């Protein structure tokens, strides 16, 4: 079971590496890692389990965050606010297309690998199309917008050594870009 002690923190070199693509079939170890990542997200969102194990709540986790520089992410978002849920374990995810229009969370973003609150708006694409494989190597294609699009972009950034705060404007951290949509 993954706990907070397994999640590496900001400053660890793995968080700035470009993760390696995986080939199929996945090793049993990689499959177990991906399942454990999903399990962490579910546990972190369960109040009792999170309290028992000292877990911070999360909706996404990338393998580099547990010091595995591999292109694997898990997203567990039981309700996106519009009645749609997202429960994915993805391998080698890629953003294939994206909207010009940007979106941001008015409260900024957080990260399980970043302990402190870093104020500032993170502008991302409002819509994205993602291609990946599931744990068995089947092709997956997702069209996302709004909050789910932001979550998946955040996790894919981890696979490329990018942290959310890299996008925050140092001069005007709380100023929304023109035409950007608040999510």
Curated annotation (Swiss-Prot):
EC class of the enzyme, as a word: hydrolase
Chemical reaction(s) catalysed: N-terminal N-formyl-L-methionyl-[peptide] + H2O = N-terminal L-methionyl-[peptide] + formate
CDD domains, sorted: Pep_deformylase
Molecular function per GO: metal ion binding; peptide deformylase activity
Annotated positions binding Fe cation: 111, 154, 158
Record-annotated active site: 155
Gene this protein is translated from: def
EC number assigned by the record: 3.5.1.88
Organism of derivation: Staphylococcus epidermidis (strain ATCC 35984 / DSM 28319 / BCRC 17069 / CCUG 31568 / BM 3577 / RP62A)
Protein name: Peptide deformylase
Keywords: Hydrolase, Iron, Metal-binding, Protein biosynthesis
Primary role: Removes the formyl group from the N-terminal Met of newly synthesized proteins. Requires at least a dipeptide for an efficient rate of reaction. N-terminal L-methionine is a prerequisite for activity but the enzyme has broad specificity at other positions.
Cofactor(s) needed by this chain: Fe(2+)
Native organism taxonomy: Bacteria, Bacillati, Bacillota, Bacilli, Bacillales
Family annotation (HAMAP family): Pep_deformylase (MF_00163)
Family named by the database record: Belongs to the polypeptide deformylase family.
GO biological process terms, semicolon-separated: co-translational protein modification; translation
Cofactor note: Binds 1 Fe(2+) ion.
């Amino acid at each position: 079971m993954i706990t907070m002690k397994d999640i590496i923190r900001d400053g660890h070199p793995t968080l700035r590496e470009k993760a390696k693509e995986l080939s199929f079939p996945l090793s049993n170890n990689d499959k177990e890692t991906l399942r454990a990542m999903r399990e962490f997200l579910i546990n972190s969102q369960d109040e009792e389990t999170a309290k028992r194990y000292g877990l911070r709540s999360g909706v996404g986790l990338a393998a580099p965050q547990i010091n595995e520089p591999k292109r694997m992410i898990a997203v567990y978002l039981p309700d996106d606010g519009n009645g749609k849920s997202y429960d994915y374990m993805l391998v080698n995810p890629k953003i294939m297309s994206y909207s010009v229009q940007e979106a941001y969370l008015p409260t900024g973003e957080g990260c399980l690998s970043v302990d402190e609150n870093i104020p500032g708006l993170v502008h991302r694409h409002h819509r994205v199309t993602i291609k990946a494989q599931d744990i068995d190597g089947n092709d997956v294609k997702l069209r996302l917008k709004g909050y789910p699009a932001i979550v998946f972009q955040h996790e894919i950034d981890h696979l490329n050594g990018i942290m959310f705060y890299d996008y925050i404007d140092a001069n005007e951290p709380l100023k929304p870009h023109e035409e950007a949509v608040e999510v």
